[in-house]
Structure formats: structure tokens, C-alpha cells
């Protein structure tokens, strides 16, 4: 371009080229400066985070691509940095929020854990308190039970002391008294244990401990009892040496009889029969050693005699004793029951006694008491004695006498005083249940009596010891235990008292042997006999009879026969009393002389006491039950009261709700009932309003018709007045006006029909051209206003004169409904059109008839006075 310009400048003016070159250079400099300024501004905007807008170069030059790319890259990086910063801030905000939420959750969890721990602690404390209260209540209960049991034991001890003091004898020495006290203490302990077993609940640990204490006390008392029995045996020994031998004297025999007990109940038996089992256990523990070590008895006598004796015993007692019970049977019953009863209570001891008595009785009874034996017991001597006397040599019989006397003497002494034995019986024998006595006593007696009797025989005559006693005891035990079980299970135990003649008649062999031993034997065996008597526990004679009165009658008959022997009874009673004292001290009882009446009195007293105690227990139980029932009833009443209050509250609420619902329903029903009434009223009102509107429309239409008729009359009058002499002009005007009038009248009639059709569509449907009868009279129709219209000559303007009111009812006529105005507007529109057409026709007529212009003008004025009036009135 520079070259072209220079070439052109060479041919033209050089000043223009220079100017052009200068201008280009100046523009380039300006562009460079602007570029530099843009770069500086961009750096400044980057530093201040302000975007710089691109300013185009004035001279049209463009930036380079690398600069553009660099700027775009910088913008992108800046944008990315901003986005990263925003993201980082958002992340930090999220982390902060999550941290706060986590801390809040941890605090909530810690709070819940703390609350749970507090609740558990409170629950644990409440449970501990409840358990403590329960333990306290249980402790109080058990202490009360123990207090009651101790009180009962104290009362029983007092009663026992009073009872033992009734028949105490003055001949007992201090040692027997101490022994009696100790034996009574053991009985009290055992009674306490039995009372605890009966009365106290077995589930308590304190009671078990008390029972264990009682057992230890019982063992201790049993050892004391054995020591006392040893001391007492020494006193027996001394007294037996001092006393003379009394032979041929009969004693009172206490028969320990089993009779079916009808009056006693199971509660009485259970209450009475516990202590016996406990009393018979201690001897068993001590005596188990002796039978196998020391038992040695006469060989043939002990082996051969028992079978027959046992057979006779059980046959007679079980089969013949109870049913017959006559006078003739009394000897047999007594003789047979003597060994049998001891078999029932202590089988082995009874076999020893029966053997020795049957072996020893024939010779001694014949030698000592010939009269008594011949008169009373021929059968016994025949049945029992022959084989025994033949088989038993004199040495054996003499050596066996100590053993016989060991068992026979205490029997006689025990049987003689009924009172003491009756007192022993209620405590020791009557209170024992059949099974317990059957199971416990045989073992105890088997292990106790052989020891004592055989110790006596060892000390008295050591040569007479035999080696067959264990075998015999085992055989007898095996043979007798089942029979004893059968008999004792079917009968309960009671006491039967017989007189001394019956003893003399029925039981001659043991008594006679006893007395003969006391006479003939040296004094050495007798102390042993008296020594062994205390430890032979319960050698009472037991006999299963059902009719006690018959046996008593038999005893009375025997009494009459044996009056000669009755003189010696006092001595025998004294001797037997002493024996009884010593034996009862070993058997844990005290002595006393009593008859059958006293024994029955004591028995009745004991039964009465047991009954009273049972009644007291029953009353206590009933009282506790009543208290429990009262507490339960009170709780039930409280629950029912609470429940009744809640139910009443609920019933009140339900009643209130029901009343509210009923009220609401009543309101709704009233509204429902009033709604159709209101609807009916609204319909009636609407119908009335519609009727009013219709009447108003009819009245207005009648007024319009009346006004039209009046206008027609007026037009006719005007036409008559305005007629002139010019006939032609009048004819033309008349024809034109008549045509116009007819057209206007036709238009008015059409408009009237349209208005009537709009107002009364039912008339059109019925095919009638007019509505029904008008109710409004024509006299009441309002008069419409009239106005005059003048047409000027040169123009077509209409000059209206001021409105004139023939009747001042325009104000009332304007007060119409929207329907009326709309109908009138529809009617007035065609009339205005017709009016314009009429005006054009009149103008033509005026132009044609220039001569009669004035007259035509007046007619047209009169005509125009009618037509626009209708349009105005309808518009109004």
C-alpha cells in the first residue's frame, strides 16, 4: 500500500501520502499503547479478583492466539480455584455439622445410659428393701412360732409335773427322784420335737436347726438315762437283798390290749403317736454290739421250746381270745396272752421270756403253789410243761431262772399297780403309732433285752451260757415280725386292767417262777435281775381283743373264786410298787398307785387335753383364715371401689358424650327439617316475586296499549283539522301520510306482538296471539308524556321543544326492571329505523309538492309528533 501510495503520490499531490502515512503510524502507536494498557489492567484485575472487559482496538487489529489462549487458561484456572475454595468451605461446613451432630448424639446416649443406671439402681434398692422386709416378716413369724411352741412345751411340762405329783410315793429315794427328773426331761424334749413336727411349717431353716438341737439333746439325755438306769439298778440290788422272798402272791396284771379304736380320729392318733418312735431309737444305737458278742443261752431249752409256745400263742390270741371272752376262757387268754403280748411289742424278748417261763414253770409251780396251780392252770402245765421239763435238765432250768426273773419280775411289778402303769402308757405306748412301734420297737427290744438278760445270766451263772441264742433270736424275729405287723396294723392300742385273781389263775408260771427264784436262788442273781429290769423297755402284755368288758367280767368272776388269795395282795402291791418305781425310772416315768377308775380318769383327762389343744389349734387356724379372708375381702373391696369409681367416671363421660351426640343429632335433625321449609319459603318468595314482576309487565303493556289508542285518536283529530281546500294536494298528502301511517301502525303492531311474545311465551305456545285476561283495569293506566318535534325548511335538523308532561308520572315510570328496559330497547330500534325512512319519504313528497308545502309541513309535523314519541318513551 505504501508503494501504491507512493506511486500515486508521484503522479498526484505528495502531501496526502505523507498525511496518510502519518495517520497509519499514529494509529499503530495508539494500538500498541492500548495493548500495553490492557495487559497492565488484566494483571491488576487478577490481583484484585476483578474481571476486565475486553476493549476492541479502534483500528481493527486483533490480539494474537497465544495471548487469547493464555488469558482463557488463566480464566479457567481462576474459576477452578474458586470452585475448589467453595468446595473446601462446603466440606468444612459439613464436617462441622457432622461433628456437632455426633457430639449431640453422644451426649444423648450418655444421658440415657445415666438414666437407665439410675432406674436400675432404684429398682435394685427397692427389691433389696422388699427382700429385707420379707426377711423381717419371716423372722417375726418364726420367732412367734417358736415362742408359741415353747409356751406349749412349758404348759405341757407343768401339766406333767402336776400329773406325776398326783401318785408320788414316799418310799422313793433321792436317786430315783433325780433319775425320774432326768427321764422326764428327755420325755419333754421328745415331746417338744413331736410338737414342732406337728405344728411348725417344715420349710423353715430355723425349725430344722431346732429339730437338730432337739436330737442332740435327746442323745445326751439318753446317755444320762443309761447312767441313771445303772445307778437305779444298784439301788434295786440293795433293796432286793433287804426284802424277803414272797412266794405264792398274785399281783395285778396290766394287760396291754389292742382294741379297734372307734372314737379317736386320725388327727388325735397323729398328734399322740409321734414321740414313741423317737423314744425307742436311742437304745438301738448302744445295744447293737451285745447280742453277737455275749449271747449264750441254754441250748435245748431255747431251741425246742419256742416253736410250740409261739404256735399256741398266736393261734389262741388271734383266733380265740376276742370273740369268746368268757369265764372259762379267761385262764387261756391270760396264759396265752402273756407271751404273745411281749411278742407283739418286742418279739425276741417275749420269746426269751416265754421259753424260760415255760421251761421253768412246771417244777416250780408244783413245788411252790400246788393249790393255786391245780385249781387254775391245768392246761398250761399240760400244754407247755411236759416237753420243756423233759428236755430241759435241772441245771439248765436253774441257770435259766435268772433270765426268767429278769423279764418276769418287772412284768409282775409293772402289772400290779394299774395307776403307775396307766400313767406310763399314755406317754410311751399310746402315743406310738402302730407302724412306728412295730418297726422301731422290735429292733430296739431285740437288741436291748437280750443284752440285759444275758448279761445277768453271765454274771450269775457263767457256766450256763449257750451259743445258739443268735440263731434263735433271728428265727423268732423272722417268725413273729410279720404276724405282729398284721395284728398291729388292724388294731389300735389301749389298756386293759385285770385283777389279781385273774393273774393268779391265768398267769401262774411267770409269777411263780419269779417268786421261786426270789426264794430258792442265791442273792447274787437277784441284783442282776433288778439291774436288768430298767433297760427292758415296754415289756407290757399286748392282746388283740375287741370286747374289754367281757374280759373284765371274767376277771370279776375269777375274783370271787379267789378270795383266799386276796389277803396277800397288799404285800404284793408294796413289793410291786417298789419294782414299778425302779422300772419306771428306767422307762422314763414315775410311780404311783392307782386303780382302773383313776386310770380311766387320767386317760379321759389326757384325751380332753389333747382335744382342747386340737380345738385351740383349730381356732387359731380358723382365726388366721378369717383374718386372711378379711384382708382379701378388704383388698377386693378396695379394688372394686377403685374400679367402681373408674366405671362411674367412664359412665359419666359416656353419658355426657351420648347427650352431646343426641343434642348434635337433634340440631342436625332440626336443620334438616328446617332446610326444606326454608327452601319452600325461598321458592314461595321467588314465585311471589315472579308474579309481581309479571303483574308489573302486564300493567306496563296495558298502559302502552292505552297510550297508543289515545295517540291514534289524537292523530285523527289533527288530520281533520289540518285539511285544506286544495283537494289534490290533500289527496297526495293523505295518500302519502296514509301509507306512512299504515306502515307505522303495522310496525307498532309488530313491535307490540314481539314485546308480548317476549313477555308471555306461554300464549304463543298455546296458539293464541294474545295473553290471558288482564287483571289490571284500564282506568289505573298511567298516561305517557308527549313532545313536539319541528322540522326546519332548509335543513333536515329536527328541532325539539322542551318536554311537556301531561301527567307527572315520569319518575315512577322510569323505575323499571332491567328486563323491561331491554325489551323496550329492542322494540325502539326498529321504530327509529322506520322513522328515518319516513323522514326521507316526506322530504320527497315535499319536493314534489312545492305549492302545498306549508300544509304538508304541518301534517308532517303532526305525524312526527307521534312517531319519535314512542321511541323516546321506550327508551325512557
From Swiss-Prot:
It is found in: Cytoplasm, Cytoskeleton, Spindle. The modification Phosphoserine is found at residues 185, 322, 441, 457, 461, 490, 524, 770, 817, 832. GO terms for molecular function: microtubule binding; tubulin binding. The keyword Disulfide bond does not apply. This is MAP7 domain-containing protein 3. Residues 214-244, 425-438, 465-475, 613-639, 680-697, 861-876 have a biased composition (Basic and acidic residues). It comes from Homo sapiens. The keyword Nucleotide-binding does not apply. It holds the Pfam family MAP7. Residues 72-137, 170-246, 407-475, 509-533, 613-697, 723-754, 802-876 are annotated as: Disordered. GO terms for cellular component: cytoplasm; membrane; microtubule cytoskeleton; spindle. Residues 65-144, 558-640, 689-724 form a coiled coil. InterPro entries: MAP7_domain-containing, MAP7_fam. The modification N-acetylmethionine is found at residue 1. Interacts (via N-terminus coiled coil domains) with tubulin and microtubules. Belongs to the MAP7 family. Residues 831-842 have a biased composition (Basic residues). Residues 171-183, 191-211, 510-521, 820-830, 848-860 have a biased composition (Polar residues). Promotes the assembly and stability of microtubules. GO terms for biological process: microtubule cytoskeleton organization; microtubule polymerization. Its main location: cytoplasm. Induction: Expression is cell cycle dependent with the highest levels during G1, S, and M phases, and low level in G2 phase. Residues 742-752 have a biased composition (Acidic residues). Transmembrane segments: none annotated. Keywords: Acetylation, Coiled coil, Cytoplasm, Cytoskeleton, Phosphoprotein.
Amino acid at each position: 500500500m505504501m508503494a501504491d501510495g507512493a506511486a500515486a503520490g508521484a503522479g498526484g499531490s505528495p502531501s496526502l501520502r505523507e498525511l496518510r502515512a502519518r495517520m497509519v503510524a499514529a494509529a499503530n502507536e495508539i494500538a500498541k499503547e492500548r495493548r500495553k494498557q490492557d495487559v497492565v489492567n488484566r494483571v491488576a484485575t487478577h490481583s484484585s479478583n476483578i474481571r476486565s472487559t475486553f476493549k476492541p482496538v479502534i483500528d481493527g487489529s486483533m490480539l494474537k492466539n497465544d495471548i487469547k489462549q493464555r488469558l482463557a487458561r488463566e480464566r479457567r484456572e481462576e474459576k477452578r480455584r474458586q470452585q475448589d475454595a467453595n468446595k473446601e468451605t462446603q466440606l468444612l461446613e459439613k464436617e462441622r455439622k457432622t461433628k456437632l451432630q455426633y457430639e449431640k448424639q453422644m451426649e444423648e446416649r450418655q444421658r440415657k445410659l445415666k438414666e437407665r443406671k439410675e432406674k436400675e439402681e432404684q429398682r435394685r434398692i427397692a427389691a433389696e428393701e422388699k427382700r429385707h422386709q420379707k426377711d423381717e416378716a419371716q423372722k417375726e413369724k418364726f420367732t412367734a412360732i417358736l415362742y408359741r411352741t415353747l409356751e406349749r412345751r412349758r404348759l405341757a411340762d407343768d401339766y406333767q409335773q402336776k400329773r406325776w405329783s398326783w401318785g408320788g410315793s414316799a418310799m422313793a429315794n433321792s436317786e430315783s427322784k433325780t433319775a425320774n427328773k432326768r427321764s422326764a426331761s428327755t420325755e419333754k424334749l421328745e415331746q417338744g420335737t413331736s410338737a414342732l413336727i406337728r405344728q411348725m411349717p417344715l420349710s423353715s431353716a430355723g425349725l430344722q436347726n431346732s429339730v437338730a438341737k432337739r436330737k442332740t439333746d435327746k442323745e445326751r439325755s439318753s446317755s444320762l438315762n443309761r447312767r441313771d438306769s445303772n445307778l437305779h439298778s444298784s439301788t434295786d440290788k440293795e433293796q432286793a437283798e433287804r426284802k424277803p422272798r414272797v412266794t405264792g402272791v398274785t399281783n395285778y396284771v396290766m394287760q396291754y390290749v389292742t382294741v379297734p379304736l372307734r372314737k379317736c380320729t386320725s388327727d388325735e392318733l397323729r398328734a399322740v403317736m409321734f414321740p414313741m418312735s423317737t423314744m425307742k431309737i436311742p437304745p438301738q444305737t448302744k445295744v447293737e454290739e451285745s447280742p453277737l458278742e455275749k449271747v449264750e443261752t441254754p441250748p435245748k431249752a431255747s431251741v425246742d421250746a419256742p416253736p410250740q409256745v409261739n404256735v399256741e400263742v398266736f393261734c389262741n390270741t388271734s383266733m380265740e381270745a376276742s370273740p369268746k371272752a368268757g369265764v372259762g376262757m379267761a385262764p387261756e387268754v391270760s396264759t396265752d396272752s402273756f407271751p404273745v403280748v411281749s411278742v407283739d411289742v418286742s418279739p425276741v424278748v417275749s420269746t426269751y421270756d416265754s421259753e424260760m417261763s415255760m421251761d421253768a414253770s412246771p417244777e416250780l409251780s408244783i413245788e411252790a403253789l400246788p393249790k393255786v396251780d391245780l385249781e387254775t392252770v391245768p392246761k398250761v402245765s399240760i400244754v407247755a410243761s411236759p416237753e420243756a421239763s423233759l428236755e430241759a435238765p435241772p441245771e439248765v432250768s436253774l441257770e435259766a431262772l435268772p433270765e426268767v426273773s429278769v423279764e418276769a419280775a418287772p412284768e409282775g411289778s409293772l402289772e400290779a399297780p394299774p395307776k403307775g402303769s396307766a400313767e406310763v402308757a399314755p406317754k410311751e405306748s399310746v402315743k406310738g403309732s402302730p407302724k412306728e412301734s412295730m418297726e422301731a420297737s422290735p429292733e430296739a427290744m431285740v437288741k436291748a433285752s437280750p443284752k440285759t438278760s444275758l448279761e445277768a445270766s453271765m454274771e450269775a451263772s457263767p457256766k450256763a451260757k449257750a451259743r445258739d441264742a443268735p440263731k434263735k433270736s433271728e428265727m423268732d424275729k423272722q417268725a413273729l415280725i410279720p404276724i405282729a405287723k398284721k395284728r398291729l396294723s388292724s388294731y389300735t392300742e389301749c389298756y386293759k386292767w385285770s385283777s389279781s385273781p385273774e393273774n393268779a389263775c391265768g398267769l401262774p408260771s411267770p409269777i411263780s417262777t419269779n417268786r421261786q427264784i426270789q426264794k430258792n436262788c442265791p442273792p447274787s442273781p437277784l441284783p442282776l435281775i433288778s439291774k436288768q429290769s430298767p433297760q427292758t423297755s415296754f415289756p407290757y402284755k399286748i392282746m388283740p381283743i375287741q370286747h374289754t368288758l367281757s374280759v373284765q367280767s371274767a376277771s370279776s368272776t375269777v375274783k370271787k373264786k379267789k378270795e383266799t388269795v386276796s389277803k396277800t395282795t397288799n404285800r404284793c402291791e408294796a413289793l410291786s410298787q417298789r419294782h414299778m418305781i425302779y422300772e419306771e425310772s428306767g422307762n422314763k416315768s414315775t410311780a404311783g398307785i392307782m386303780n382302773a377308775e383313776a386310770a380311766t380318769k387320767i386317760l379321759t383327762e389326757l384325751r380332753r387335753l389333747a382335744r382342747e389343744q386340737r380345738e385351740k389349734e383349730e381356732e387359731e387356724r380358723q382365726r388366721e383364715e378369717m383374718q386372711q379372708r378379711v384382708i382379701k375381702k378388704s383388698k377386693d373391696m378396695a379394688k372394686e371401689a377403685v374400679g367402681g369409681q373408674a366405671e362411674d367416671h367412664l359412665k359419666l363421660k359416656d353419658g355426657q358424650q351420648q347427650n352431646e351426640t343426641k343434642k348434635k343429632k337433634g340440631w342436625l335433625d332440626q336443620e334438616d327439617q328446617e332446610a326444606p321449609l326454608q327452601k319452600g319459603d325461598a321458592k314461595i318468595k321467588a314465585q311471589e316475586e315472579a308474579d309481581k314482576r309479571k303483574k308489573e309487565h302486564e300493567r306496563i303493556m296495558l298502559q302502552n296499549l292505552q297510550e297508543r289508542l289515545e295517540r291514534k285518536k289524537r292523530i285523527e283529530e289533527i288530520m281533520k283539522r289540518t285539511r285544506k281546500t286544495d283537494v289534490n294536494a290533500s289527496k297526495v298528502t293523505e295518500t302519502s301520510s296514509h301509507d306512512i301511517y299504515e306502515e307505522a301502525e303495522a310496525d307498532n303492531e309488530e313491535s307490540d306482538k314481539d314485546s308480548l311474545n317476549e313477555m308471555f311465551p306461554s300464549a304463543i305456545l298455546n296458539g293464541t296471539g294474545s295473553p290471558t285476561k288482564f287483571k289490571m283495569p284500564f282506568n289505573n293506566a298511567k298516561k305517557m308524556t308527549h313532545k313536539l318535534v319541528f322540522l326546519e325548511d332548509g335543513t333536515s335538523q329536527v328541532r325539539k321543544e322542551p318536554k311537556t308532561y301531561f301527567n307527572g308520572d315520569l319518575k315512577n315510570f322510569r323505575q323499571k326492571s332491567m328486563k323491561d328496559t331491554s325489551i323496550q330497547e329492542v322494540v325502539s330500534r326498529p321504530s327509529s329505523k322506520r322513522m328515518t325512512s319516513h323522514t326521507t319519504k316526506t322530504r320527497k313528497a315535499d319536493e314534489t309538492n312545492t305549492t302545498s308545502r306549508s300544509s304538508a309541513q304541518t301534517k308532517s309535523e303532526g305525524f312526527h309528533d307521534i312517531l319519535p314519541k314512542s321511541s323516546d318513551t321506550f327508551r325512557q
